[in-house]
A protein has these predicted regions:
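Residues marking helix boundaries in flexible regions
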Residues: 14-15, 37, 369, 373, ...
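Juxtamembrane/start-of-transmembrane alpha-helix segments at the extracytoplasmic/lumenal side
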Residues: 353-368
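Bacterial N-terminal signal peptides
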Residues: 27-37
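C-terminal membrane-anchoring or membrane-association module
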Residues: 371-401
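Residue-level detector of intrinsically disordered terminal segments
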Residues: 9, 30-32, 45
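N-terminal pro-sequences and low-complexity stem/linker regions of secreted or lumenal proteins
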Residues: 42-350
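N-terminal secretory signal peptides that target proteins for export/translocation
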Residues: 1-19
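Position-driven detector of the extreme protein N-terminus
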Residues: 2, 32-34, 47, 366
């Protein structure tokens, strides 16, 4: 065999070996490229998982005390009584001013101060209706939620200006406390003020299809608020009208995608009753116990609360659930309503949107190790083949000599 042929053959062997090594390295690189996109995700709302619930729906009813509603002490809310007996009720009361166990009170008279307190932790001196709009410089629960990466939306039946800062419910801000806060007066936040269509008749089938549609959406908000109109909330139609409305609407809520597939809770509460109220800053001499009921898959069943609560307790419950700081001393000192939930998980104060960790994904290390082993095996086999071919060449050269 000529030296030229021998050199050409050896060159081909070296070229094949280098090519195989490059191929192995390319294989490892491709595997790494496949692993990283498959296991690295975009921003994740770290605050979405709550201590007791991940999603909250709130419905505000109007102007009736505990015993106006509960049939156990003379009320006429048969559906609301059944719902409370199935899931939970805050307290066992014998009158609107007396409970043998627990109880939930309003914080103001008339309505608007209660609505402001529910989202702001105080009525800020507004002890009558008619205050609107954007005048309060204080902060609300919305700002706390948004800073934690939590989402929200607030519906009002038959409002005009849906999704804009011209949003105007039938009772203006009297029954929609969000409108009193100046920080809400931005186009980004006003997008979350939404109108929903009320039933044509309070005793007919519930409509509210816009509101219900949001509960069946792929990504429901962490908190969804509903202010019914004055027929549906019992303000003008009395307990029987409001009870009929809820008897149609609540089953649709509890059978929604949100309540079937998420850790969701429904809170139904009246803004105020018909008597005095004693928790500060309310200036009554007697309690004003209200119907306040939690329901849904995360709520205890057939449970009667033993703690003493008011509207600030609702706010405290939201803050405790998602690790949010207090707005005022009122909610800071209130008791959270955690006793109503079947189980709780420890949650740290959420820190907003953060990327999920690549290395903590359980699929990452097995795939990387598999890729490395595959590459090593490929290199070993390639080297053995190259060594065998070199021996063949050397044998051929020896024989030629």
């Amino acid at each position: 065999m000529s030296r030229r042929k021998e050199g050409t053959k050896l060159k081909k062997i070296i070229t094949r070996t280098v090519t195989r090594k490059k191929t192995a390295l390319l294989l490892l690189s491709l595997m790494a490229m496949l692993v990283i996109p498959a296991t690295t995700v975009g921003p994740k709302a770290m605050g979405a998982t709550g201590r007791s619930f991940d999603n909250l729906v709130v419905i505000l009813m109007e102007n009736n005390g505990y015993c106006d509603v509960m049939t156990s002490c003379g009320g006429s809310g048969s559906y609301e009584t059944s719902l409370a007996q199935t899931y939970s009720i805050a307290g066992s009361c014998q009158s609107d001013s007396s409970c043998s166990s627990g109880g939930y009170s309003g914080t103001s008279h008339p309505s608007e101060g209660n609505y402001i307190s529910l989202v702001g932790g105080d009525n800020f001196g507004h002890t009558s209706d008619g205050y609107c709009c954007w005048g309060l410089a204080q902060s609300s629960i919305v700002a706390k939620m948004e800073s934690a990466g939590l989402t929200w939306q607030a519906y009002a039946e038959d409002a005009s200006g849906s999704g804009s800062c011209s949003f105007d419910p039938p009772r203006h801000a009297d029954h929609f406390g969000f409108l009193t806060f100046n920080e809400m007066h931005t186009s980004a936040r006003c997008l979350h003020f939404l109108a929903t269509t009320s039933p044509s008749n309070p005793s007919g089938s519930a409509d509210d299809h816009e509101f219900l549609g949001s509960l069946n959406a792929p990504n429901p908000a962490n908190m969804t608020w509903l202010t019914p109109n004055d027929n549906d909330n019992g303000h003008d139609s009395g307990v029987s009208g409001g009870d009929s409305y809820l008897s149609n609407l609540v089953p649709l809520i509890l059978s929604s995608n949100l309540f079937k597939t998420h850790r969701a809770a429904l809170f139904i509460v009246y803004d105020e009753g018909n008597s005095g109220c004693s928790p500060s800053p309310c200036s009554g001499s007697t309690n004003d116990f209200l119907y306040a009921s939690w329901s849904g898959p995360v709520v205890k069943q057939a449970y009667v609360g033993t703690g003493s609560y008011n509207h600030y307790s609702f706010l405290k419950t939201v803050e405790t659930n998602w690790g949010l700081s207090s707005l005022t001393s009122n909610d800071a000192n209130a008791s959270p309503m955690t006793e109503f939930f079947a189980s709780t998980t420890t949650t740290s104060p959420p820190s907003g949107n953060q990327p999920a960790s690549f290395w903590t994904n359980p699929l990452v290390m097995p795939v990387i190790l598999g890729a490395i082993l595959t590459g090593i095996v490929y290199l070993v086999v390639s080297r053995r083949r190259s060594a065998t071919k070199r021996r063949v060449v050397q044998t051929s050269e020896t024989q030629a000599k």
